[in-house]
Amino acid sequence: MNKLYIGNLNEKVTAEDLVKTFEDYKIPYSGQFLMKTGYASVDCPDDQWAMKAIETFSGKVELHGKRIEVEHSVPKKQRTRKLQIRNIPPHLQWEVLDGLLAQYGTVENCEQVNTDSETAVVNVTYGTREQARQAIQKLNGYQFDNNALRVSYIPDENSEVDSQRGPDNGRRPGYGPRGTSRQMSPGSGIPSKHQHADIPLRLLVPTQYVGAIIGKEGATIRNITKQTQSKIDVHRKENAGAAEKPISIHSTPEGCSAACRMILEIMNQEAKDTKTADEVPLKVLAHNNFVGRLIGKEGRNLKKVEQDTDTKITISPLQDLTLYNPERTITVKGSIEACCLAEQEIMKKVREAYDNDIAAMNQQTHLIPGLNLGAIGLFPPSSAMPPPALGNSVPGPPYGPMGASEQETVHVYIPAQAVGALIGKKGQHIKQLSRFAGASIKIAPAEAPDSKMRMVIVTGPPEAQFKAQGRIYGKLKEENFFGPKEEVKLETHIKVAAAAAGRVIGKGGKTVNELQNLTAAEVVVPREQTPDEHDQVIVKIIGHFYASQLAQRKIRDILTQVKQQQKGGGMGTPQGPHPQGMTELGSPQGLAQEPRRK
């Protein structure tokens, strides 16, 4: 995306005028300016310079009395579903942006773009061309917190190929939207053994030491990359004027740790030589989605890392998170050796959390065609994402044998004091959430005046459930209804036919125990339940978001199998007792553990 379209040009503008403008602002270009009536085009050296040119010139620079418009040059055949939205207020919450984008159609993907500007930029993929066309018409110039959004097409290199292929878009299972393998085994949807290489080690280093890390003409950093077999990106242009700069290290876990050690040694030596600090702490950046599991229940995981490595570890507060900054800063203080050991333990936990989320996500994408966590802000956009379901840009196959449109009702229990935050001012937040998720969301009346928990009733198809519940979990964390070292775990209830409850439990509790071990959620069928007027009983699920979602989907899968068998002439002998004779399940041993792999 390094070719630029320069529009709204006065007829008096010449190629020399554009050359001078680019040179005045020190924006490099390659080749010549191709002049047409009212517009021109030119190539930039790379995507980053093209983005810099757009941010510098578009709507800001005048030539012969007219403000020029600069955007990516996109051939008509590639103006399909992909848009770039610029000038987004940096402190805007994801859910607000999601709600706005979702008004114009299904958002398949939404990724933030790293830029030098103070405002945020995202690339968005809509479900259809028409949805993208409507979004560009409605959102271009849209005023958001005194910022006028700028929206333009970006090239969809796959569009011409897709139009020549069948309804499956010519994509092979296990391949991403552009046909490139994303570290997946083709057709499997399962992460390959090299998946860890997709989790970069992100460090935050004082700006004053960046020069020493890079070295004269890049000699030092080339030496680090060569010795550690890694790729290192020093983001010098991010957050101009900031006291610290991020560094991304891409390699094996061992390669990342070796590069980290060398960088830490260089910084400490530079601090000693310049007498600027006695020691330089190690700062690791980790996406907020993983931090809760790094901390552990009551902070146990973090305390163990501190004790085992003889370090002091602190984590930045949740209040620092914004659309522009989804990462938390983990600060490690101690000797160089101790800090390096702590880095290994920290990243081990982060990678485990990532792998478990990938596993949960693969379950979701298998059961809910077209589901994309990146599109709803629940998964780090920088991570390698599992491939979309086959034929992601066309209507997906039905959800299981029962069809995709089947409505589900889930009761989610939240702290009573969180109700106001979930509803929002004049009901604005809950309305946005409902629109975004495509689900009905209602707050049930309190069971008693002093009730500590309130029931949220979520009704909608599987993907809507996933989006809505994910946002509810996220809102509670954002609003600090759970402590900084506490993972959000909620209780959800789903109703199942009394005749099918035994199948959920399994013979001797085997099914429910396997379910708990697989999902790390607590699954409880309370004893001595009396079926309601619809002959249904409640199944309780307690756990963090991914655990709860996977448990819900597995239970729904069991219920679908029961319905199939009933249609085929009876479900046979139940594998468990009648619900009135059930025994209450205790807390599973695996509740605080990672799901077992089979």
UniProtKB/Swiss-Prot annotation:
Composition bias type Basic and acidic residues, residue spans: 162-171
Residues with the Phosphoserine modification: 185, 587
GO term, biological process aspect, one: CRD-mediated mRNA stabilization
GO molecular function: mRNA 3'-UTR binding; N6-methyladenosine-containing RNA reader activity
Classification via PROSITE patterns: KH_TYPE_1, RRM
Ranges for region Disordered: 155-195, 561-598
Keyword Nucleus: yes
Record key words, sorted: Cell projection, Cytoplasm, mRNA transport, Nucleus, Phosphoprotein, Repeat, RNA-binding, Translation regulation, Transport
PTM annotation (Phosphotyrosine): residues: 399
Modified residues (Phosphothreonine): 573, 583
Listed SMART domains: KH, RRM
Location relative to the cell: Nucleus; Cytoplasm; Cytoplasm, Perinuclear region; Cytoplasm, P-body
Domain annotation RRM: ranges: 2-75, 81-156
GO cellular component: CRD-mediated mRNA stability complex; cytoplasm; cytoplasmic stress granule; cytosol; filopodium; growth cone; lamellipodium; nucleus
Pfam families, per the entry: KH_1, RRM_1
Superkingdom, taxonomy of origin: Eukaryota
Chain intervals with Low complexity compositional bias: 574-583
Record function comment: RNA-binding factor that recruits target transcripts to cytoplasmic protein-RNA complexes (mRNPs). This transcript 'caging' into mRNPs allows mRNA transport and transient storage. It also modulates the rate and location at which target transcripts encounter the translational apparatus and shields them from endonuclease attacks or microRNA-mediated degradation. Preferentially binds to N6-methyladenosine (m6A)-containing mRNAs and increases their stability. Plays a direct role in the transport and translation of transcripts required for axonal regeneration in adult sensory neurons.
Family of this protein: Belongs to the RRM IMP/VICKZ family.
Assembly and oligomerization: Component of the CRD-mediated complex.
Domain-related comment: Domains KH3 and KH4 are the major RNA-binding modules, although KH1 and KH2 may also contribute to transcript binding. KH1 and KH2, and possibly KH3 and KH4, promote the formation of higher ordered protein-RNA complexes, which may be essential for IGF2BP1 cytoplasmic retention. KH domains are required for localization to stress granules. KH3 and KH4 mediate association with the cytoskeleton. Two nuclear export signals (NES) have been identified in KH2 and KH4 domains, respectively. Only KH2 NES is XPO1-dependent. Both NES may be redundant.
Protein's name according to its UniProt entry: Insulin-like growth factor 2 mRNA-binding protein 1
